[in-house]
Amino acid sequence: MVAKKAILVVFCILSLVMIGCSKVVADLGMQRKPYLGTDLKIDGYYYSEPMWKEKESFAVAVFYRNGVSMLVFLEMGQSPERDFLLNESFISDMKSKPHSIGVFSINSHSLEMENFIGRGFRHTYKSYYEIINDSTFVMKRFIGIEGSESFHNLKFKFKKFSPKPDSTSVYIR
């Protein structure tokens, strides 16, 4: 009888530990859809002008035909190629946590992205853009953690680049 109670207690403790250590991953609100359009070039990346004056940084966005997007914020002086696109450690970390990876959709001249933030697997952010032409778009709205909303007029420009990182991720369905 005592042995059965001990086994039951150990089983309960192990169950609680396993539940506590599991990763809760937020689902993206947007669905991944293949991108078949020509509204944006996808054979490279887009980089923004400097943003957030108190913290000199800029954004880099990458799009794929399978509907996956990557959006990364870098500090001024960092290289999009060296510190992001060709940095295997960063890419591996981005896919395993997840952060910065997500999906996008285009409707007429509007671009919408939803990407993981990476803080505890539970958060995503959405950003909305106006497409100017196939090599330029402007961020208009950004919705962050817990719905915090900010408005921008941040211009992104295209730079041809190859090879882009692989876009597969277990967190993108």
What are these regions (language model features)?
Residues 1-31:
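Bacterial Sec-dependent N-terminal signal peptides
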Residues 21-101, 112-173:
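Lipid interaction determinants
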